Amino acid sequence: MKVKGFALLALGLVALYASRAGAAVSKTTWADAAAVQYVFVENNSDDNFFVTPGGVLDPRMTGASRWTGLKYTGSGTIYQQSLGYIDNGYNTGLNANWQFDMWLENAPVSYPLSGLRCINWYAGCDMGTSLILPQVTDANGFYGAKVTSGGQKWMHGMMSDSFYQYLQQMPVGGSMSMTINACQTSVAYDASSGARCKDQASGAWYVRKVTHTKAASLKLINTHSLTEVFINSDGIPTLGEGNSNCQEQTIGTRSGLSCKMVNYTLQHNGLSNTSIHIFPAISNSSLASAVGSYDMQFSLNGNSWKPVSGTAYYYTFNEMKASDSVYIFFSSNFFKQMVAQGISDINTQDLFNFRFQNTTSPESGWYEFSTSNSLIIKPRDFSISIISDEYTSSPTREGNVGAGEPALDFGYIVTTSGKTAADEVLIKVDGPAQSIAGRSYCLFSSADGTAKVPFPAQLSLTTQSGAVKTYDAGCDSRWNDMTDALWLTTPWTDASGDVGVMNKTTVKFSIPMNDAISLRTINDEGWFGEVSASGEIHVQATWRNIN
């Protein structure tokens, strides 16, 4: 009797344990994935990052940290359709209306993931973010993301900014390993209260260790360099100020202008890759249709050239390894078609960009980046421009406040071009401002916005009489007349025989550092630390009675 009773008790325990096992999440631990290589792009021109496979796609770590001009918005060609994400290499589909957790063991950074990545134009995905927000995130991952119905979703975790920053600082040749946990369940649980998918009565939990090696680092360098180009009605370009990156050039039968437009550094561990392509693309569709493919060409050395024609012509990663620059050639017909299309007074960063395509990763292999250097393209007939005398788009200064401290001085070159000299030329300074006792001051602020400090500002120029003329210019957007400046005149003649003049002068914008008013904030409080401000200087020219 005692033996039978013991046997019945044992059977009862076995049945109980079997019942509990059948009601638990099923856990699958896969073999470690083979190490894969990636290429990291640090874009200093647009302040974002891009990561893309250097070899095979899976396990995935691919995509940009920010949307670019290639973002799909519901119409047109589909290029960039999500931000960057990771997975365990199995690209496992998710069930609609289930909940999903993803967390990392040995995570490279704290808070590495922001939520469930999806394709932005699929039903149930946010077109603006390509992200399904979880109920909660923590130092290891995210929990309780509701899988929306509609388009397919996969076990993909969107990478956070801190994840990209970790990849940025990794040395070329370095590797990182992490164990990815991905779990989905039909049970509706409250992740914000601490519940997790792996603890539910049913579901599927997958575990896999992945390793990624940084095979290359491509850094796109923003030089802030500016060059002026004036074009006549025939499209013939004339170089203005800051022309060190450009030269007149003839390629075959086409004459025009070639300019160094991208500066980069590329470090690698010997990676060989031909699936990564770069090429330029014209942003204006009408202009792109009007010009021929050889009217805009690009080169890695300024000697051998490829035409710009969609994705047909490109340079590969392997070809980029032998260079550090990208050059663009613009034919006279390119500029002529700009005039015909009514495109003038434009910065090349608004005219074209460079595209990056990795054919290995079709959904997240598209990326776009701006040029390192900029051309300001102006019509030679009736135009005005202003450019820093350092030929940079973003001149900066810093200094200390107090008696005897030197002013922050910014020098500019103003150019007008037309059939005659301009009848009126005006200049103004825009920026944060504060009026005190009837006078406008430029307003500098601390990073947290608590300290706001007034600074006087001045514009000064040399007049035709040789005297120095000074204007109070406290960032108040008030136009000041500079028509009587001392202009250096250069005559020009078009191929058609039309004549005109190009006039240049210099102007200085100064912010004194020794004015007593800047020792206190606008609330009349003392301050200590750093304050900053940014603004713009605008010019305007008027021609009258022109035939």
PLM region spans:
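N-terminal signal peptide c-region/cleavage motif recognized by signal peptidases
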Residues: A18-R20
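Bacterial N-terminal signal peptides
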Residues: L8-L16
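Amphipathic, heptad-repeat alpha-helical segments used for oligomerization and assembly
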Residues: W487-E525
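Post-signal peptide N-terminal segment of secreted/secretory-pathway proteins
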Residues: G69-P171
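Outer membrane beta-barrel transmembrane domains
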Residues: A447, K452-T493
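Long, charge-dense tracts
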Residues: M296-E319
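Bacterial N-terminal signal peptides that target proteins for export
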Residues: M1-A7
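N-terminal small/polar-rich segments of proteins
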Residues: A23-G93, M155-G157, D161-S286, V326-T462, ...
